[in-house]
Amino acid sequence: VGAKTALLSAQDLDQFLEYYVHLAAPVDADIDIAVACSELKSLIKGVGDLAFEIGASTVNVQDNGGPCIDLPLYPIAEMPDSPVIPKDAVPVLLPTSFATFLAHAALSTSSDPTRALLAGVNVSEIGVTATSGQDLYHIALPLQLLPKDIVINYTTALANLKQRWVSLATWTQGDERQLFAIRGEGFTYIASGVNGTYPNWRGVLPSTNEKV
């Protein structure tokens, strides 16, 4: 019986994203190809079916019954290895609205490129926090099983993950590099966190003598 699921993946130096995509027809052979993401994206004009015909050096792509266009294939051997989530990186189940909370928190981050930590969103065992140093967003969430705080850059890729987010795992690679993985319905997203210790955001709260 041929496979009816394809794995679509892309990565850069800081993040990796893979999707499981349902195929309209089964594929009887193991096929592994690489094309330029920007070229493939330029062919997709909207929601619909994509048809692929794979040749020796090109793949013929037809979007939703439109014209067929050839894309050059790139050597699989030149593709970087996909990151691996360590077995000891225990996933923490995420609240249903976690993606929404992260998006809201990103609105309170700093746009100052010299303040890398404040440009990200801090996720800790007590919840999600972001501050520009002038305003503050914090929502308490039950993430007590999270072993260590992680500061997440809210990238375009994260903003476009509309499927349900299920779990978050964090780990340290080498001495300093922090990484995290978000798994959801049909996808896995892995990226580097922002190194360093997030500032004491409670200092942004107004004092008890100030009017709120």
PLM segments and residue spans:
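Structural preference for solvent-exposed beta-strand-turn elements
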Residues: 1-212
